[in-house]
């Protein structure tokens, strides 16, 4: 079973021009084009090697600034179009948000390497008694703002540490709870 996602990327995608002898695919056709031909990530990687992703407008709309995540049971990849062509990144976090570019999002996860779903061990000083006064204190420092960068860190932490149930119904429910960790309520984020 394959899945896909996409995010809008603010004016940094660089699509290629149509090339003779290559499979030219418009950015808005990428996901159905891939899912119509591939059953797993291995097949996706082979197919992408033959493709030229172009910035064809959709009707009167300009070419959408998109990047993509494609996943199967074996893992996930992220696709971004840059001035150097289509970049295919392994995505061990299995999540994606708008900005910054994917390699930077992954690098910035280093800022949260000390976070844990477990209660923290007190290492500050043996001279000061500490008391954990709430569950979830191992995740203190996890960003809570609505920026793409913060949502990436938060959803990566939640996805990588959450536990799904044994049934498909429980797993689908957990999927929506993970998405809920990065909800943006109307009016809280202008622009």
Regions flagged by a language model, labelled:
Residues 11-52:
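Compact, glycine/acidic-enriched structural inserts
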Residues 7-8, 71-73, 82, 158:
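Structured loops at beta-to-helix junctions and adjacent beta-edge loops in soluble globular domains
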Residues 26-30, 93-96, 103-106:
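Glycine-rich loops and low-complexity Gly/Arg-rich segments
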Residues 40-41, 45-81:
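Aromatic- and glycine-enriched pocket-lining scaffold segments that form the walls
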Residues 57-58, 63-64, 73, 97-191:
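C-terminus-biased signal that marks the final domain/tail of proteins
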Residues 12-19, 88-93, 99-100:
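A short, polar/proline- and glycine-enriched secondary-structure boundary/capping micro-motif
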Residues 76, 80-85, 90-92, 110:
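Aromatic/basic-lined ligand-recognition segments
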Residues 1-10:
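Single conserved hydrophobic/aromatic residue that forms the stacking wall/gate
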């Amino acid at each position: 079973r394959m899945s896909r996602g996409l995010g809008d990327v603010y004016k940094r995608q660089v699509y290629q021009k149509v090339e003779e002898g290559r499979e030219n695919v418009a950015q808005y056709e990428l996901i159905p084009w891939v899912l119509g031909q591939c059953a797993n990530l291995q097949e996706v990687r082979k197919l992408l090697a033959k493709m030229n992703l172009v910035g064809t407008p959709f009707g009167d709309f300009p070419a959408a600034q998109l990047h993509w995540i494609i996943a199967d049971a074996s893992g996930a990849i992220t696709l971004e179009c840059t001035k150097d062509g289509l970049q295919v990144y392994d995505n061990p976090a299995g999540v994606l948000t708008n900005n910054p570019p994917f390699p930077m999002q992954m690098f910035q996860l280093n800022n949260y390497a000390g976070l844990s779903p477990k209660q923290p061990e007190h290492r500050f000083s043996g001279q000061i008694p500490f008391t954990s006064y709430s569950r979830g204190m191992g995740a203190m420092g996890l960003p809570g703002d609505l920026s793409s960068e913060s949502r990436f860190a938060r959803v990566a932490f939640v996805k990588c540490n959450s536990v799904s149930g044994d049934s498909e119904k429980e797993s689908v429910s957990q999927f929506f709870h993970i998405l809920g960790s990065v909800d943006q309520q109307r009016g809280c984020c202008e622009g």
